[in-house]
């Protein structure tokens, strides 16, 4: 793998850090447990660390890679014939069209580029109905945010939306020295499985997303100030929410209650949440 890296200059703008530890690669492939006939999608195959061993198991693998140089690099390997290649940004790929073509739930995995990992997660959450599971290598800090509880430093909008949509498990942490070039931060391998039915009820997830975004834009402000234009102190108290609390102190259930109150009482009825 180190020899491969020397042949390809990693691009900072694409957050290219390649996993080189073969034991970890085997561990990841074993956990993903790819099967024949599944719709498997790899985000950013890179130098083929996961691509090759997975292609040894399956007959077809869909890969999305924005760097044409990397795709040209992979062409020299025999497993390339098993790949269905899309040279484009994973954020704008048409996953819904893929689902309709294959008529199967999609399994997505990969070492997500650091600079767009959060954006990609939100993108996939919105498509939860067509996804079977997701297995990603993420920045450790992002992984901690995914599973964070109210009242903790890591808890935020990502925690709320992620837990609304998915059951999330931290599988293992990966030290930075297992990548080339060596990043400044450690990583974590995470498994996300969309809920068949969310444990949290909201009339409209877009409203929940809106108010959590509003609340956490200035997370140190108390709710009376961050959400005061929507909820009066009287309404907060009616919903058993202390207006003196900060955004990080409210549970997912409480945010759902706030979003449902907006819908049920036609608050912000002229607001476009798209």
Curated annotation (Swiss-Prot):
It is found in: Cytoplasm. It catalyses: adenosine(1518)/adenosine(1519) in 16S rRNA + 4 S-adenosyl-L-methionine = N(6)-dimethyladenosine(1518)/N(6)-dimethyladenosine(1519) in 16S rRNA + 4 S-adenosyl-L-homocysteine + 4 H(+). Its EC number is 2.1.1.182. One of its GO terms (molecular function) is 16S rRNA (adenine(1518)-N(6)/adenine(1519)-N(6))-dimethyltransferase activity. The keyword S-adenosyl-L-methionine applies. Keywords: Cytoplasm, Methyltransferase, RNA-binding, rRNA processing, S-adenosyl-L-methionine, Transferase. It holds the Pfam family RrnaAD. Coiled coil: none annotated. InterPro entries: KsgA/Erm (IPR001737), rRNA_Ade_diMease-like_C (IPR023165), rRNA_Ade_Mease_Trfase_CS (IPR020596), rRNA_Ade_methylase_Trfase_N (IPR020598), rRNA_adenine_dimethylase (IPR011530), SAM-dependent_MTases_sf (IPR029063). The keyword S-adenosyl-L-methionine applies. GO terms for cellular component: cytosol. Its main location: cytoplasm. Signal peptide: none annotated. S-adenosyl-L-methionine binds at residues 17, 19, 44, 65, 89, 111. It is an enzyme of class 2 (transferase). Specifically dimethylates two adjacent adenosines (A1518 and A1519) in the loop of a conserved hairpin near the 3'-end of 16S rRNA in the 30S particle. May play a critical role in biogenesis of 30S subunits. Belongs to the class I-like SAM-binding methyltransferase superfamily. rRNA adenine N(6)-methyltransferase family. RsmA subfamily. This is Ribosomal RNA small subunit methyltransferase A. It comes from Buchnera aphidicola subsp. Schizaphis graminum (strain Sg).
